[in-house]
């Protein structure tokens, strides 16, 4: 008889809807944060990907900068600066790069925040579930395990959901942050190239 009961336990797999119901309102909040983080990642990936392509195209036409990309705007910021004004040239380049950084890093902090909040909400769900379990024990005793199942399910499911959401979001944040930093580094490299070419022209002149 016990084998049949064990087989029934293994054969029953809760659906996603049932898992969400077991997690309660906290589980729903965790899943909502995960969906928000995923949407942010897709948005930032699409934006940074398009910026990367425009910057790469601009790098092939370095003598014809346009305002459609960060690199072009940085190069245009030093138009009209004389070759002899090296300090002013460097200041304008630094200012232009700093002006581009917020747009490239926008949303990264929010993705990281969502990744940090999710396991904490899972812990909150765990504590809440255990409180419900102890309340059931104090009211009805331990005679019927089904009365405690709801609280225990919430305690376990919210912990799992918090980790399931947090771990991918950490990878997403690392990917988006690395992509943004690589483009900022490319801007710095191009600025160094402008200063080097200016120094060569001064030396040649």
Language-model features, listed with the residues they occupy:
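Hydrophobic alpha-helical transmembrane segments of multipass membrane transporters and ion channels
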Residues: 25-31, 106, 110-123, 157-165
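Helix-start (N-cap) segments at beta->loop->alpha junctions
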Residues: 12-16
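Extended, hydrophilic extramembrane loops/domains of integral membrane proteins
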Residues: 1-11, 84
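Predominantly long cytosolic amphipathic alpha-helical stalk/bundle segments
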Residues: 49-124, 128-143, 171-205
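Hydrophobic alpha-helical transmembrane segments
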Residues: 17-57
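Pore-lining and gate-forming transmembrane alpha-helices of multi-pass membrane transport proteins
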Residues: 146-177
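Alpha-helical transmembrane segments
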Residues: 32, 36-42, 124-127, 131, ...
């Amino acid at each position: 008889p016990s084998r049949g009961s064990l087989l029934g336990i293994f054969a029953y797999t809760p659906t996603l809807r049932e898992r969400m119901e077991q997690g309660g309102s906290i589980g729903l909040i965790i899943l909502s944060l995960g969906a928000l983080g995923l949407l942010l990642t897709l948005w930032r990936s699409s934006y940074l990907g398009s910026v990367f392509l425009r910057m790469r195209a601009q790098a092939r036409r370095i003598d014809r900068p346009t305002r459609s990309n960060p690199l072009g705007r940085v190069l245009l910021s030093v138009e009209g600066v004389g070759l002899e004004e090296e300090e002013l040239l460097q200041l304008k380049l630094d200012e232009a790069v700093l002006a581009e950084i917020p747009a490239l890093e926008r949303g990264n902090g929010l993705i990281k925040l969502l990744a940090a909040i999710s396991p904490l909400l899972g812990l909150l769900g765990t504590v809440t579930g255990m409180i419900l379990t102890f309340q059931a024990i104090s009211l009805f005793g331990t005679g019927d395990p089904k009365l405690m199942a709801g609280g225990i399910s919430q305690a376990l499911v919210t912990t799992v959901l918090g980790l399931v959401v947090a771990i991918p979001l950490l990878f997403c944040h690392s990917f988006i942050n690395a992509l943004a930093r690589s483009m900022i580094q490319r801007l710095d490299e191009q600025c160094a190239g402008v200063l080097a070419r200016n120094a060569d022209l001064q030396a040649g002149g």
